[in-house]
Amino acid sequence: MPLTWKDSGLRWYWVVVLVFLADQLSKQWVLANFDLFESVKLLPFFNFTYVRNYGAAFSFLSEAGGWQRWLFTLVAVGFSTLLTVWLRKQSASLWKLNLAYTLVIGGALGNLIDRLMHGFVVDFIDFYWGKSHYPAFNIADSAIFIGAVLIIWDSFFNSKSEQDKTEEVK
């Protein structure tokens, strides 16, 4: 029997909305208050620094000439659709997977909007040690990372009762 939205992982879709709004509001704040490459030191190891990312994680393919914008758009739409279908098919009680999928979807959609509106992703979270800087990122990237970690965690530490719930839904 198909699950209703209340019984399925779709019940967790509020996380998508929360991540998306936090990401977009933070990026709009950066765009309104920072010039490109402007930096504000917040802690001895942490800045807000406005940079543009034309690629993916760690600026992967950022110098590819523009076609990557559409590749990453297709990837974001594809993964968001796939994870939404999976949410629809699994029990709302599988909190780790539901939270993981919704974090990834919210992050993917946040970066997708940037790519479509600006042609780049707004990054601004800048951790560093001495003169070594970790690549700048944003709230969407953080959500995707945390979601991926939860998916991996769940795959290694999924309890027998949670596996049974997943099997019942299939």
Curated annotation (Swiss-Prot):
It is a multi-pass membrane protein. Keywords: Aspartyl protease, Cell inner membrane, Cell membrane, Hydrolase, Membrane, Protease, Transmembrane, Transmembrane helix. It is found in: Cell inner membrane. The active site is at D123, D141. The chain crosses the membrane at residues 12-32, 67-87, 93-113, 137-157. GO terms for molecular function: aspartic-type endopeptidase activity. Its EC number is 3.4.23.36. It holds the Pfam family Peptidase_A8. It catalyses: Release of signal peptides from bacterial membrane prolipoproteins. Hydrolyzes -Xaa-Yaa-Zaa-|-(S,diacylglyceryl)Cys-, in which Xaa is hydrophobic (preferably Leu), and Yaa (Ala or Ser) and Zaa (Gly or Ala) have small, neutral side chains. Pathway: Protein modification; lipoprotein biosynthesis (signal peptide cleavage). GO terms for biological process: proteolysis. Its main location: membrane. It is an enzyme of class 3 (hydrolase). PROSITE patterns: SPASE_II. InterPro entries: Peptidase_A8. It comes from the Bacteria. One of its GO terms (cellular component) is plasma membrane. Belongs to the peptidase A8 family. This protein specifically catalyzes the removal of signal peptides from prolipoproteins. This is Lipoprotein signal peptidase. It comes from Shewanella sp. (strain MR-4).
